[in-house]
Structures are given as structure tokens and as C-alpha cells.
Amino acid sequence: MQFLFTFIFLLIPLVYSLPAASPKSGTDFDFNQEIETFVEQAFNQDDPSQAAAAAASFEEFLVNVFNYDQADGQVDGQVLKVFEKRDANTEQTIEGILKAVNNSGVIWTLLDSVADDPSRIEYIGNLTSSFLKNYNITLNIADLLSESSSLTENLNITGLLSAVENSGLITSLLDGILLDENFRPRLVDLIDRLVLSQKNVLLYIFAGVLSKRDLMADGELVNVLLKRATSNDDSYSGSLGSFLNNAASTVLSSSLVSNAVADVLNALNDTGFLVYATKRFLSSDSYINMTVALVNDIVSSSSVTIDTSGLNITELISGTLGNPKEIAALVGSLLSGDSSQTSQLSNYLGRYSGALSQILQDLEKKGLFAELNSYIFGDSTTKASATATATATATSSANGKNVANNNNKDAATSGSATSNSSTSTNTKSASNGAGAVIYTGSNTQTTFLKALTILFGGALLFL
């Protein structure tokens, strides 16, 4: 469940991060017309050679994967057995499809047509919310994280993780994101924005969990992070969720899915498609803003109920942090280059230790830790009232950031993506001691803040 847990901690700050670029306004969005226009432009039906090539490719796909009989135009009835006995041709077919889709630019053309127009984003958000609202979907976070849930009991997590590891996809993704020095400024900028959007969460950790004070109850914190819906009037409430849960357990535990996952993962790794797509997506503020807007619309519409009643925030944080002093010491040693103190950490991080050290140093140059230190612990000239609460400090100082829209999306694949902000030291206006409920006049917590940056804003680095 490490992947799910990491995804939750990444999604929450992403949703609550302020948009960094303003998409241009457009006209009313006619979904059907847009799809027709898009298909006509992307696939030129007047070109016989292109049509013939597309037909041949599709027929080859049917023959190799579905055992398609061209004579009678039927698919063999033993489709599932064919899937389970697939050979290397299937993986090659998937690779060919990925390359064809990527080279056509279909994905990015479609994303651009939506991301650059607020009315289209709103339309898709409303359409999705209306569809989901009819099914009364409830996500129980505690149940998903529990090893005893019906989904995790039937799901072969070990097999899926093994398939991911054997494909080499995670290594390729980490190499492409962390070791690309041209992409690193963009990564630093994203981490900076995500962490600043979660200043109140950090305040809760320091002033509530680590200080053993009840600054904010777990339920109150969750209400700040996620908007919960309370509509349970339907007597059949949860029936669809139970069905989908059981169906997903059955499907995901089958050898059919395991084989398919392995082929797809290998194809994604061999083609480099995922690394390219991830870097290109992260290089565009308009894509990020679109994602934030869509998730906000869905969550705010209460079409999906997120149940966190069984989630013990304090226990999760305490278990994640372990020994705070030890973490702070390791991060401090990593920054100072003291190899005698960080040999074990360096061995664990391997070739990424240098990249992580540089990321932390760049974040320090941007003034991230100084701002967090001032916001949470106060400075030597300011002492905050002990009655301040995390909810009273909801306004993030990230409002002062101006990040230009990155139009060069293709730079990601060539390793030439550029940062939207300089890594030179920036002067940021922080509410000195605004959240310093417990600590005042201390700069000794800076290394600990850097550690928390990795745990929360930088969780992507450890996927």
C-alpha cells in the first residue's frame, strides 16, 4: 500500500496548490463537435496510404492478441486463453501502438485543446461529477490502507510489485526525472510549490503531533485537507461500491491481468514513453492547473465521498517520521557532504544521493526552508500568541509566486526542459511566527524541515 499512501500525500497538496498560470479564455465548448474536428485533423481519411497503414496495423493487433480469424471476421472464443499464452509479439505490438500514439501527437493535442480553455475544463469537470454523483461512490481511506480489506486480501500485491520491479520502469522514471540536470530546476520548483501549499499540515505535525499537544484533532485536520460528503439517504448506499470492490479484486488477482500488466510495463519502459510523458506533463503549468481544477470540481461536488473516519493521522505521521532527530541529522549530513555520517543513506539512495542533495540545496536557495522556519517556529524578533491555530493560517504565502507558463513542452523528452523560476535566493514575505504556537526564536529546526520536504512534497522521489 506504499504506492497508494504516497499517491494520497501527493494528490492532497496538488489539489490545494494555487494555480501558477492563467489559461486563456475561449468560446463555448461543444464536446461532440470538438471530437469530430479532432479526429478529422489527427487522422486524415483522404490519404489512402495512411488509411491502409492504420487498417493493417489494427488487423495485425487483432491477429496477434485476440487470435482474430480474418476469414469469417470473428474473434476466437478462447480469448482469455490466448491472452494468458501471449508471447513477445504482444509486447512488441503494444510498443508499436505506444510509439504510433506518441509520434502522432494525439495525446498532447487533446490535452492542449482542453487545458488552454477554462470553459472546456469546467465542462469536463461537470460531466464527470454528474456521472459519478449518480452512483454514490464512497472511498474509505483506512480500508484501502488496511491489509485486511477485501480488495487487498484478494489482490496479489507482491506479484504486481514484482512485475513493476522486473520491468525496470521505476528505475527509468527515477533516472529520467532525478538525473536530468536540465529538468531538475522544474522539479525543484514543483516541490517548492507543493510544500508551501501544505504549511498548515507541517504546522499541525510540529505543534500537534511532535509536541504531543492537541492543537488540532485528527478529524479537524482531515476536514481541512478533504471536503467530505455526508449524503447517505439511499437505502442501497454503498452497493455499487461493494460490487466494484469485489469485481476489482477478482479481476486484478487473475493471471490474465498479471500477464497484461507485465507486457504493458515492459513496453512502457522499452519505449521510454512514460518518462517522456511524465516530464512533458510536469513541464506544463496548464496541464497541472487543469488537473487541479478537475480534481477540485469532483471533490467539491460531493460526487465522491471520501471517508476518513478510521484514519489515525497521528499514528501514520509518527510511524512515517520514526526518529525525527535521526532524520534531521541524516539530512544535515547529506547537505554538508559528510560521507562518514551518511554512508548508509548513500548506499540506500545509490546514484540518486547526489541528485537529492542538489535538490535540497536548490530548495534552500529558493528560501523554502527559511520561510517554513519563520512560519512554523517564528524568528528571533517575533513571538506569536499561543492561541493561534492552524486553521487561522490557511492563507499560503505561495500567493506571491509568479510562475510563467512553460510553453516548450517538447523540451522534456530531449532533456532541455527549463525552469520557470530561478534557483537564486529569493526574498519571500512570510508571516513571521504566524503559526509558531510552540516554538519561537529557533533556527535549529531547519534540517528537520528539509527532511519533511522529502516525506511530503518530495514523496515522488521515492516511488
Swiss-Prot record:
Q: Which domain of life is it from?
A: Eukaryota
Factors inducing expression:
Expression is induced by HOG1 and during biofoilm formation, and repressed by caspofungin. Also regulated by SSN6.
**Entry keyword annotation includes Glycoprotein:** yes
Q: Which UniProt keywords apply?
A: Cell membrane, Cell wall, Glycoprotein, GPI-anchor, Lipoprotein, Membrane, Secreted, Signal
Q: Which residues form the propeptide?
A: 442-463
Q: Provide the leader sequence positions.
A: 1-17
UniProt PTM: The GPI-anchor is attached to the protein in the endoplasmic reticulum and serves to target the protein to the cell surface. There, the glucosamine-inositol phospholipid moiety is cleaved off and the GPI-modified mannoprotein is covalently attached via its lipidless GPI glycan remnant to the 1,6-beta-glucan of the outer cell wall layer.
Lipid moiety-binding residues (GPI-anchor amidated glycine): G441
What is the name of the protein in this document? Predicted GPI-anchored protein 45
Q: Which organism's genome codes for this protein?
A: Candida albicans (strain SC5314 / ATCC MYA-2876)
